[in-house]
Amino acid sequence: MKLYAPWQRAFEKIATPFEQFLHAQTTTGLMLMLMTVVALLLANSPLSDEYLHIFHTNIDIFVGNYGFSKSIHHWINDGLMAIFFFIIGLEIKRNILVGELSNIKVAMLPILAAIGGMALPALIYYAINYGDIGEAGWGIPMATDIAFAISALVLLGRRVSASLVTFLVALAIVDDLGAVVVIALFYTQEINMLPLLFAFISFLVLVSFNRFGIHAILPYFVVGFIMWLFMLESGIHATVAGVIAAMAIPSRPKYTPMDFTKSVKSRLDEYDNYPIEDNYMLHEQQKAILQNVKDKIDAISSPSARLEHSLHLPVSLVVIPLFALANAGVSINFSSAYDTLLQPISLGVMAGLVFGKVFGIAGISYLAIKLGIAKLPEGSTMSQVFGVAFLGGIGFTMSIFIAELAFAGNSELVFQAKIGILAASLFAGIFGFIWLRFIAKSAN
């Protein structure tokens, strides 16, 4: 094919949704790591006061007498993180419908492993903090940071099988679902029924849009935003609105594949009937045909697929890095760091994320495989599953998020939890990587 500009080359890669998902999570993991380092440096530098002051600065949004007055820190955690939870909701829905969780036989192992990896860490933390002020933080070590965990696994390249990566992704998705349920049920303030009722009505409107075949994204955005506002006033954490809204987004395309192929082929045949000009300029009618084909390409992709694809980049490059910058910065007094790590909250978090995750995930997996309930991921060994269980101990994003909810208003307890999260996540990530890189043997 002759190109108008021969020195310009276009390279196109058609990636599967799963490959796109892995790439997005790897990008998120790298950005998360970078901004965590920046936050820690700022919090332990002469600029620490300015750093803290920025995120505690209030931003007021009022329309008449109605509005909100929250700090930048709260706008990030309650507002921007709702977009992150919306992405989680879309990923959960896709995985249940057509992804790693759509086949119950394949999904059984990661589902059981995730349950073990949530229950045992919570029990270990609760046992250490039973009857103490930190008891409410039992949900902190339940979470796995999917971005960090997948980034570590992707760095191992061909040393791990694709099915092992799929196992970790499915496990983390179930883990995220569990974390959302825990946040909604157990980390909720006093519930205000009227705003909650309006939020429910907003959700019903979103469902009706889906049922009536509305595929335009704008109506879902407007009503979803209204639902988030009501959820913010209801007492249930506003980020839950993101997950609920995702469930109402249509997952079916406007056209069937057969109708799409027939329609596009007809339009392209019409396009070819026009003569090619010497200067390669298109006729106006050709431009209209191409626009029509573009519209049909958009229509063959479901709204949920389009949103997941378009939001991954801003979430990876803006939302998650801002969350890390606002929440990961803890001022560490190295002379008392050891004492902090020995506090029940820090100990509970570390024991939960390291020992709880490892024995919860690997232990349940081993039992399920031995009992014939589930099968080992193809091309993998139990030793590799043990390494993946260590990576499951990287709690970070969701763990910090739950810590902020569990100990809201008590900065000292939040600090202890964050120290435990940072220490456990660092240890779990490094040890899991070393185990999979140098110790675990692959099936091949």
Curated annotation (Swiss-Prot):
CC annotations in GO: plasma membrane
Catalyses which reaction(s): Na(+)(in) + 2 H(+)(out) = Na(+)(out) + 2 H(+)(in)
Subcellular location(s) per record: Cell inner membrane
Pfam family, one: Na_H_antiport_1
Superkingdom of origin: Bacteria
UniProt KW keywords: Antiport, Cell inner membrane, Cell membrane, Ion transport, Membrane, Sodium, Sodium transport, Transmembrane, Transmembrane helix, Transport
GO molecular function: sodium:proton antiporter activity
Membrane-spanning parts: 27-47, 72-92, 108-128, 136-156, 167-187, 190-210, 212-232, 312-332, 349-369, 385-405, 419-439
Membrane topology: Multi-pass membrane protein
Main subcellular location: membrane
InterPro entries to which the protein is assigned, alphabetical: Na/H_antiporter_dom_sf, NhaA
UniProt signal peptide: none
One GO term (biological process): regulation of pH
Family: Belongs to the NhaA Na(+)/H(+) (TC 2.A.33) antiporter family.
Its biological purpose: Na(+)/H(+) antiporter that extrudes sodium in exchange for external protons.
Annotated protein name in UniProt: Na(+)/H(+) antiporter NhaA
Species whose genome carries this gene: Sulfurimonas denitrificans (strain ATCC 33889 / DSM 1251) (Thiomicrospira denitrificans (strain ATCC 33889 / DSM 1251))
Lineage: Bacteria, Pseudomonadati, Campylobacterota, Epsilonproteobacteria, Campylobacterales
Gene: nhaA
